[in-house]
């Protein structure tokens, strides 16, 4: 019997062919509740000093608040959270876009999941030698104002040489076409990385324009709470605005191999301390 989280040959074949894989009931209802309850506590203690996050406008990636979030638990507001008067239009807990990017290191509840046997076994199946979580995000996709995430590849932002980023997207609520589930182009990871975000002394830029994608090629990845979506670093994926009346909470981890793969000094995310590996061969 395979260890918990391990992938079968059939699952590995599907992932290799399509660039994504949905694992049903990866986390228990108790694990999901623990993470959601913990985030509610973190938000309750949040003093409101954050920044706005948008994938359409990357100006926020140029500021110090964003850069420092690499090793902090930082709060980012939705673009549409504020009125013309500069005040929140809804309660604080309904105004946050995401919390990142070091929950997996600094919070015991999220660290327990991130360093758990299921996650480690999954990356052992993918033949990672020394995997490490490089960033973590709790994403809210708030009702009515949950922002669009434009088509992208994770390796654009989290590049190693050779490329090694794999994303884990854990649904903490049911994700449907109505409330902003993930969409992906099956097999698009085979076309290679199209562009990179480059960080210099105090700025960021893309080395190539954003490609144009045919929306008809995307398929919805509707999942239940507790399901996990595994995402190849070159897979083209996106999510639309959440215009519904229900949120779509999710936890996102991005994992790289730290053995035989060099973290780019041009990535926006630069750490003072190397990330702790999930395991070492």
UniProtKB/Swiss-Prot annotation:
Q: Give the pathway.
A: Lipid metabolism; fatty acid metabolism
- UniProt KW keywords: Dioxygenase, Iron, Metal-binding, Oxidoreductase, Vitamin C
Q: Where does Fe cation bind?
A: 152, 154, 237
UniProt binding sites for 2-oxoglutarate: 98, 137, 152-154, 169, 239, 248
UniProt xrefs under Pfam families: PhyH
Give cofactor(s), names only. Answer: Fe cation; L-ascorbate
Name the reaction it catalyses. Answer: phytanoyl-CoA + 2-oxoglutarate + O2 = 2-hydroxyphytanoyl-CoA + succinate + CO2
For biological process, the GO terms are: fatty acid metabolic process
Q: What is its EC number?
A: 1.14.11.18
Q: What family is this?
A: Belongs to the PhyH family.
> What is the protein name given in its UniProt record?
Phytanoyl-CoA dioxygenase 2
Q: Which organism is it from?
A: Oryza sativa subsp. japonica (Rice)
């Amino acid at each position: 019997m395979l260890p918990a989280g391990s992938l079968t040959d059939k699952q590995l074949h599907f992932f290799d062919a399509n660039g994504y894989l949905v694992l049903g009931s990866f986390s228990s209802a108790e694990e999901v509740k623990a993470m959601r309850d913990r985030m509610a506590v973190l938000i309750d203690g949040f003093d409101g000093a954050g920044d706005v996050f948008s994938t359409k406008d990357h100006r926020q990636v140029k500021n110090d608040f964003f850069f420092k979030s690499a090793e902090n638990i930082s709060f980012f507001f939705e673009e549409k959270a504020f009125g013309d008067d500069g005040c929140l239009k809804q309660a604080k807990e309904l105004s946050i876009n995401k919390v990142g990017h070091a929950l997996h290191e600094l919070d015991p509840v999220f660290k327990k999941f991130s360093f758990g046997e299921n996650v480690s076994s999954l990356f052992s199946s993918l033949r990672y030698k020394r995997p490490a979580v490089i960033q973590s995000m709790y994403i809210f996709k708030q009702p009515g104002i949950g922002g669009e995430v434009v088509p992208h590849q994770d390796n654009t932002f989290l590049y190693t040489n050779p490329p090694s980023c794999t994303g884990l997207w854990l649904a903490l609520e049911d994700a449907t076409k109505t409330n902003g589930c993930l969409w992906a182009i099956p097999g698009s990871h085979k076309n290679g990385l199209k562009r990179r975000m480059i960080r210099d002394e105090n700025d960021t830029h893309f080395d190539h324009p954003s490609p144009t994608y045919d929306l008809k090629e995307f398929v919805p990845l509707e999942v239940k709470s507790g399901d996990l979506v595994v995402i190849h670093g070159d897979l083209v994926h996106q999510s639309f605005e959440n215009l519904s009346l229900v949120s779509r909470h999710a936890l996102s981890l991005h994992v790289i191999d730290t053995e035989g793969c060099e973290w780019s000094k041009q990535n926006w995310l630069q750490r003072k301390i190397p990330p702790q590996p999930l395991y070492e061969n």
